[in-house]
Amino acid sequence: MTTRSLSTFLTSFLLVSLDWVSKLVVLLKSCQLSPHSPALLYSYVWGHFSFLIVPSFNEGAAFGLFAQYKIPLLIFRVFVILCLFLFLGIKFRSLHIRTRIALTLILAGALGNVGDILFHGKVVDFLSINYYSWSFPSFNLADAFISLGTLLLVGHLYFSKEDKKYF
């Protein structure tokens, strides 16, 4: 394993750790404040915009989709993680740095959420953004990593001026 590939997997591990620690802190703080129901841990209001930290649980995929298919969804997620590991392991040297960063973020986010499912039976979400009466579905750092990685990957694939060898 090269130094670069080791740093990629170490970065992924650190991001997963950051995600899990943030969820643990939110859950512990929530239990201290209100042991029987989710507690508002933090709020920031700026005009009609608000940012809240309130623990919630998601048994499905993004936005709670497919919650009734827990086992197939878990199998699919594990399959995607294994594919990402294999792809990064096999193609690592030939990947563009932006592709590597994007896939590392996606891998870390996927691992963070699968870890939640294995340990809690559901994903722990706690970040909430609201504007007027509109609320974006709650999310966590793992979701943010997946979203950022996807945006980086799509941006790189779409806007790359280099030869069209993406992977």
Swiss-Prot record:
List the EC numbers from the record. Answer: 3.4.23.36
Q: List the disulfide bonds.
A: none
Cite the InterPro entries for this sequence. Answer: Peptidase_A8 (IPR001872)
Which residues are listed as membrane-spanning? 8-28, 46-66, 70-90, 101-121, 139-159
Coiled-coil annotated residue ranges, if any:
none
Membrane topology type: Multi-pass membrane protein
**Per the annotation, which location comes first and is thus the protein's main one?**
membrane
Which superkingdom?
Bacteria
The processes (GO biological process) annotated in the record are:
proteolysis
Its localization reads: Cell inner membrane
Per UniProt, which keywords does this protein have?
A: Aspartyl protease, Cell inner membrane, Cell membrane, Hydrolase, Membrane, Protease, Transmembrane, Transmembrane helix
Report if keyword Protease is assigned: yes
Q: Which GO terms describe its molecular function?
A: aspartic-type endopeptidase activity
One family from Pfam that matches here is Peptidase_A8
What are the positions of the active site?
125, 143
Which pathway does this chain act in? Answer: Protein modification; lipoprotein biosynthesis (signal peptide cleavage)
Q: Which reaction does it catalyse?
A: Release of signal peptides from bacterial membrane prolipoproteins. Hydrolyzes -Xaa-Yaa-Zaa-|-(S,diacylglyceryl)Cys-, in which Xaa is hydrophobic (preferably Leu), and Yaa (Ala or Ser) and Zaa (Gly or Ala) have small, neutral side chains
Its GO CC terms are:
plasma membrane
Could you tell me which HAMAP family the record lists for this protein?
LspA
List, alphabetically, the NCBIfam families matched.
Answer: lspA
Q: What does this protein do?
A: This protein specifically catalyzes the removal of signal peptides from prolipoproteins.
Which family does the entry's similarity section mention? Belongs to the peptidase A8 family.
**Annotated protein name in UniProt:** Lipoprotein signal peptidase
Q: Which organism is it from?
A: Chlamydia muridarum (strain MoPn / Nigg)
